[in-house]
Amino acid sequence: MEALGARGALAGFLRALCVLGCLLGRATAPPSPVIKFPGDVAPKTDKELAVQYLNTFYGCPKDSCNLFVLKDTLKKMQKFFGLPQTGELDQSTIETMRKPRCGNPDVANYNFFPRKPKWDKNQITYRIIGYTPDLDPETVDDAFARAFQVWSNVTPLRFSRIHDGEADIMINFGRWEHGDGYPFDGKDGLLAHAFAPGTGVGGDSHFDDDELWTLGEGQVVRVKYGNADGEYCKFPFLFNGKEYTSCTDTGRSDGFLWCSTTYNFEKDGKYGFCPHEALFTMGGNADGQPCKFPFRFQGTSYSSCTTEGRTDGYRWCGTTEDYDRDKKYGFCPETAMSTIGGNSEGAPCVFPFTFLGNKYESCTSAGRSDGKMWCATSTNYDDDRKWGFCPDQGYSLFLVAAHEFGHAMGLEHSQDPGALMAPIYTYTKNFRLSQDDIKGIQELYGASPDAGTDAGTGPTPTLGPVTPEICTQDIVFDGIAQIRGEIFFFKDRFIWRTVTPGDKPMGPLLVATFWPELPEKIDAVYEAPQEEKAVFFAGNEYWVYSASTLERGYPKPLTSLGLPPDVQRVDAAFNWSKNKKTYIFAGDKFWRYNEVKKKMDPGFPRLIADAWNAIPDHLDAVVDLQGSGHSYFFKGTYYLKLENQSLKSVKVGSIKTDWLGC
């Protein structure tokens, strides 16, 4: 690696990196007290949050949102999100209010802004005024172009970019109050907002630059120089037998951070340098020249990027030694080790660092009540009190932009949780525009002339996925499981949840809200109660979660459980309270798995018909309800109830009637 070349030198460069995924620091450190971090925004109380939320999104007047008005407005909000309409600030309501979302108000279905504004032309122009330092300009340009294409694919609308002058849709990034009277709120919370079609600010779309903008799966790092210039880092990558999940300076003596652009660097040798102000700057007037440290600004010497002289919080530097004389500057790019928020102006993590007398080698949640991962930006937080949040998965600029551009076309928020125009952000890996979105936009502009039309009569064909309705449709669920005391019903990318069978479950909700890494459709699911972990099966792989956190190393192949290679999918699985063993069903066979020994029991597989009384082959799901003494086997729209001790079948019933409260 010493042979890798780099432009210039980086004196005093901090070599520690903030590892993506942010594992806890020293496991041996005792629990730390919760402290107040300087520069941190104190979380709102539930009541403060509710008043602000209902005022912003449901029109409850902030100065007169008293208990009676609050209760009535709260029921409207709960109805919109499919929550129990209690009028109380219960846990599910507060959880919904705290989720990241669009800053526009909520209106049911695919309704439009007041007076249903729309563009009176099909040729729409847009202009990107500013960029986020989180992504390189090419990635931002591509994300916005793909977001517009979401709508042009299903309408006659056509979008073209201009680089000067006034466009129909002006796109920019900003922080807090950014000039339109609708301030953002720092990291998380409000992600973006857009104005309805019209003159002036009509159609304009703004994105909160206190968020970490990615493509939804962690920082997107495009390398410079090396032998893979312009390609993207591949995380994790393998170097000297070790996996790296972020840029590293390992193997170098100059402190420059690098990454491999393929998984196996030792095999492929493809690498580049990660963005850093010593390599290049963005914007400004220096044509991408790197920072020059130290540089002078208003008589003061700076040895790192600064926000001094700016009101927008963006980090910049001089590209000559004297800015006062030369007036040459550029904005500092975000690196794979930059922090977010806090009080360090995006400075990188420094490892190890000392916090309350303990040493941490990586990001930690110590000292915080919200579980957010953070790091110090000096070697000793106790002395310097400088810190920031560690990078997480971030928010998909493409998905958020596609949503906001829907507003810019005239669409309001949808009550359909499967719609792009639903107000709450949920990352979707293989995005498809829903039928609700298509119906809404085509009500305004009509269908795309490029789509084939049927001259005959009959219903309009469904173009996008439709959110299922459990009581009006005969749904065959992909999986059913009791997880942390709640019963979850899975169908495609949706779930419904309830505590008591027979009560109408809450939902539909998106699976990705709870388990974001899962594919759009699962085959089976069960909870391993001994460890309180949820296990999901899809195709020839399985996933293991602790709460909503995917265990390291997953997904894994079914063969690692001890299933034979010819088993390419699982029908159902459950942990039986009678013997604490897990049963896995596929076709007409089943296997028994020992959760303690982590291996299959000998003597399996066996035929279902030989061991289970009246249980059919090719099951859909199995659940052993905690404390009930019964297990339930689901197939199609019916279930069979089995008495655990005697193995007698005691009931056959309708899922819709007995489980869904229809």
Swiss-Prot record:
Active site per UniProt: E404
EC number(s) stated in the UniProt entry for this protein: 3.4.24.24
Record-given protein name: 72 kDa type IV collagenase
Chief location category: secreted
Residues bearing attached sugar chains per UniProt: N575, N644
Propeptide: 30-109
Residues annotated as binding Ca(2+) 3: D185, G186, D208, E211
Cofactor: Ca(2+); Zn(2+)
Gene: MMP2
GO cellular component, one term: nucleus
Annotated signal sequence range: 1-29
Fibronectin type-II domain span: 228-276, 286-334, 344-392
Organism the protein comes from: Oryctolagus cuniculus
Reactions accelerated catalytically: Cleavage of gelatin type I and collagen types IV, V, VII, X. Cleaves the collagen-like sequence Pro-Gln-Gly-|-Ile-Ala-Gly-Gln
Residues at which Zn(2+) 1 binds: C102, H403, H407, H413
Chain sites annotated for binding Ca(2+) 4: D478, D523, D571, D620
Organism ancestry: Eukaryota, Metazoa, Chordata, Craniata, Vertebrata
Family: Belongs to the peptidase M10A family.
